[in-house]
Amino acid sequence: MRTITLIVVHCTANKAGSTLRVKDIDRYHRSLGWKGCGYHYVIPTDGTIEKGRAEDLVGAHCKNHNKHSIGVAYVGGLDADGKTPKDTRTPEQKIALWKLIKELKERYPKALVVGHCDLDPRKPFCPGFKVHGGQSSDHRNLDGFRRMVFGDCLSARCFGAARAEGKHAFTMPSRDKTNHR
């Protein structure tokens, strides 16, 4: 079993509104000669949580930190022109990111939650928002992370808005260990 010390949040660096799914990322990463999707989880714009690489496998998402981290990416990160970094997370993605991080923190309570930019100065705009959220570098504080994820939107309003619009339930994918990519 791997020792997980980091949960690294990424964006996929796609235009706002992209319909990219984990299968598309998997295909692209394989075209680069990788073993499959480098992220452990991907959150498309509709807020589903899609499983990429199995958690027990080393990811391919953050140089020098893959062996001890879980990689989570939301689809987006660029504005409509595809050139300018921007926080393009939908309300559904914000809710899903919060739920996923909360679940991961239950499994890996000592892991720190960081943005890709916090570990790699060559990626200053990934994930497109400030993961620190004004909090200390100790991201064990889930309440601080919740405020960062939702920004100006109170979590209750986001959850309520999603429910009022009849959005699907946000559930974790199964942790089937046979999905080795």
What is each of the regions a protein language model found here?
Residues 72:
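Ligand-binding face of N-terminal immunoglobulin V-set domains in extracellular IgSF glycoproteins
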